Design a protein with these regions (language model features):
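Short hydrophobic/aromatic beta-strand micro-patches
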Residues: 110-112
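Catalytic core of pol beta-like nucleotidyltransferases
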Residues: 2-88, 98-104, 114-156
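Hydrophobic/anchoring residues in structured secondary elements
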Residues: 91-94
């Protein structure tokens, strides 16, 4: 559940939706949501007769928890590898299931830039998988929209 809320501050969820998503009972999800809310990690808001939960970005531990989640997923290693060896990268973003906070086993990364070495990307996929234990898909020069999480933006 931490992945859901801390991979991106924009992610949110409600009790029944989370129970379905995680294939767990509503009672176990409720207990976990209450524990995280009482500790201050999650905020609650009411919308259309539903209680919506999202990460408390003002919590002193938010940045640390987000960094831990991203390290757990192997995102930092992917970003560093891409920036160092792939070419002239302008932006790197997370998309797909992981951007929604769902640990599906396949990380989808958008890489936008000039002269990006696609052959090298294909070559390093097995190495990344071995290192982080997840499949990685690279999408070159795709649109970054509201469903993506920007991991890196080139500064001039």
């Amino acid at each position: 559940m931490l992945i859901k809320f801390f991979v991106s501050a924009a992610n949110n969820g409600y009790l029944n939706g989370l129970a379905n998503e995680f294939n767990e009972s509503t009672n176990s999800i409720r207990k976990e949501l209450n524990n995280l809310s009482e500790a201050g990690y999650l905020l609650k808001s009411k919308k259309n007769n539903r209680i919506i939960y999202n990460a408390n970005t003002a919590h002193p531990m938010f940045g640390i928890l987000q960094k831990i989640v991203r390290q757990h997923l192997g995102l930092q290693e992917i970003v560093e590898t891409v920036i160092e060896r792939i070419g002239d990268v302008d932006q790197i973003a997370l998309t797909g299931e992981y951007a929604k906070g769902i640990d599906s086993g396949n990380i989808e990364i958008i890489i936008n830039g000039l002269k990006v070495n696609n052959d090298y990307l294909e070559k390093i996929k097995p190495k990344i998988k071995k290192k982080i234990g997840r499949d990685v898909s690279f999408l070159l020069n795709h649109k970054i929209d509201s469903n993506t999480i920007v991991l890196y933006t080139k500064t001039n």
